Amino acid sequence: METDISQTEYSVILLGLDNAGKTTLLSQIKALYQPRPEGAPTPNPGKTVPTVGQNVATIPLHDMNLKIWDVGGQISMRGLWQSYYTSCHAIIFVVDSADVGQDPDITRLISRRASSTAGTRNTRGNSSAEAFSEENVGIGAASSEFGRLDECRQVLESVLQNADVAGVPILVLANKQDREDCVEVVRIKEGLVRKVFEGETGSGVRDSRVLPVSALLGSGVQAAVEWVQSRVKWNKEGRPPVMR
């Protein structure tokens, strides 16, 4: 008997620091894919407020439904992310590519952080949950020469270290590419993301990709959804979909 694809549902979680543009991204995805009643006003994805808790939307595609969870990125909310890991089929991690501080050479960030944390990694025996909380203590708004990319790196590493996301496809979106002060996606990929994924604390080989987007303007959003769509199908043996 053939499976009714309209009943196939995959869960995706949107993660990233506060003000990265996750809620705007979800609004843009909804505007692209969710049918609107006749006469309904055109959505304005630019009018959003910071997420406290979660937003959720079911996105109908031709061969599946994507249930997308937008989880708050404030420090106080990040400890709750782990409760979504076991049931998710993909992770979208949103990076604010315009928040790089005064020094755009983000490749220096990795070497500086590596030298300062090399000793502590071997002395900690904490669980991933404890490590996640400890690494985020004292990390706040942008104030360093690197803006919040250092904070972003630590948070992304914490996500990757959790055993519950092993094998889960991860899409990193370099958001706010419409801004003149943004960092190009290739620099985020080479200077930050690749070092995290392939570094000592990363998980080595992983199904992942880095794409540029402007959640505000909608550019790159469809490509992001299509990548997630293809990868959750490819990984359906490892993480089967939910049948609704």
What are these regions (language model features)?
Residues M1-W234, R244:
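TRAFAC-class small GTPase G-domain
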